[in-house]
Amino acid sequence: MIPVIDLHTHTIYSDGRATPAEIIDHALHLGLSALAITDHNNSRGAREGEGIARERGLLLIPGIEWYVNWEGYEGTIDLLGLGLDLWDAGVRRVEEEALVDFEERMAECCGYLTEMGYPLSIDEARAINPRFAGHNAVAFAAVRKGLIADSEEMDHLYTLAWPRVRPAMLDIAIAIELIHAAGGVAVVAHPHQYKRDDENWSLEDLAALKALGLDGIEAYHRRMPPPDRAHFARLAEEMDLLITGGSDEHGWPAGFRHMGKEPIPDVLLNGLLARVAALRPSSAFPLDRSERGPLT
C-alpha cells in the first residue's frame, strides 16, 4: 500500500464538525502517514491536536488556512500556511484580528441573505458553532429555521451574497511574510476556484504570486477536475513551486465523506518538509510545544 497524506482538513474550530481528536483518529483509521489540520484564520485545532497526534503516533503538520485578499483580484483567496510555528507571537496576533474581521464579514453576508428573503443573523450562526460562526454554521441555522431544505442549497445562495461582502482584511503578501516569519510555507488552496475572465490562473498569475514569496499550490483537491489538476501541476513544475494536496474535509453534513477517498501520495511531503527544514533548521516534527502553556 502506497503511503498517503492529507494536508487540508477542518475541525470544530472553523467550519468543520469533528474535534481534533476525532479527525486524528480517523486519519489513523485510514492509515494516513501525515495529516494537517488547517482551520480558517486560526490554529486552535492544530495546536490542540499536537499532543494528541504525538501520543497516537501520527505525524501532524502544523497548519492554518487564512482568508486573504490580493490587490487586483476580486474575491477572497484561501492561503494555507503549513509547517509554521503556531505559537509564534505574530501568528497569534493576526489570528485574533482575522477572526474578528471574518465574523464581521459573515454578519455582513447575513444582512445580504436577509435582504434576499432569508432572514439570518450572526447570533444564529454562533448558536450553531460558538467557536466559529462561519459558512456552515449559517447554512445550518437556515436549515434549523426552515428557510432551506439542506445545507447544500445554501451553496447557491452564497454565490449571490458573498461576492457583495467586503474583501478580507489580510493582504496575501503580508500573510506570506507572516507564514515565512513563523518558519512555514505558503500554499494557495484549491487554485481552480479562482478565475480571471472565467479562465484558470495563468503562468503570469502564479509568477506574480511567487514574486510575493508563494511556495506552492494545492494541485490535489477533491473538487479539482483532472484537466485543472494537470494544468496546475504543470504550472507548479514550470515555476518550481511545491505541490500539496488535501481532502478539505469538513465533516458536514455528517461523517468523513472525503478523507481518504482520493489517495494523495506522501512523496509530496518531502519537498514541504525540506522547505520547512531550510526555514527552521532547529525544528523537527512533531513540534513539542507543551512548555508554552494552555491554549488561549
Segment roles from a protein language model:
Residues 52-208, 267-287, 294-296:
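Extended substrate/RNA-proximal surfaces in nucleic-acid metabolism proteins
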Residues 9, 18, 44, 81, ...:
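Low-complexity, compositionally biased segments
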Residues 222-296:
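C-terminal appended segment following the main domain
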